[in-house]
């Protein structure tokens, strides 16, 4: 069970709109090695652990990854929340903006949406 604190683990306070940077950082949210996949890997793999203390460590790590996910989403949101139409056009953010406006959507920097195919969970605790 989690105890959610309504604050970020590390404060994020970005004042400047920068859709180019958001396009790069968003891969840390939904890219193949991003926080969403990492949290799911740890929280899923914990069930294969025969030792409760190791299971607990994986739960802790997966929970930590969720905190990272929240920070990454906050960064992307703050970088795009005040976009002007000119910034959308100039930055190349248009394709993302058409589908999601300034919403935060899990995808790689390449535009490939997050997929559960990027993580694995097996019953063997060694692999």
Model-derived regions: residue spans:
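Non-heme di-metal
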Residues: 1-127
């Amino acid at each position: 069970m989690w105890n959610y604190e309504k604050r970020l683990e590390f404060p994020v306070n970005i004042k400047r709109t920068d859709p180019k940077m958001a396009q790069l950082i968003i891969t840390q949210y939904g890219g193949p090695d991003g926080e969403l996949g990492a949290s799911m890997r740890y929280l899923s793999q914990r069930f294969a652990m025969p030792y409760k203390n190791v299971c607990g460590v994986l739960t802790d790590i997966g929970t930590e990854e969720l905190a990272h996910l929240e920070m990454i989403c906050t960064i992307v949101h703050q970088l795009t929340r005040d976009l002007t139409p000119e910034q959308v056009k100039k930055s190349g953010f248009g394709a993302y903006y058409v589908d999601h406006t300034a919403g935060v959507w899990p995808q790689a920097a390449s535009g490939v949406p997050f997929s559960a195919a990027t993580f694995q969970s097996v019953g063997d605790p060694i692999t």
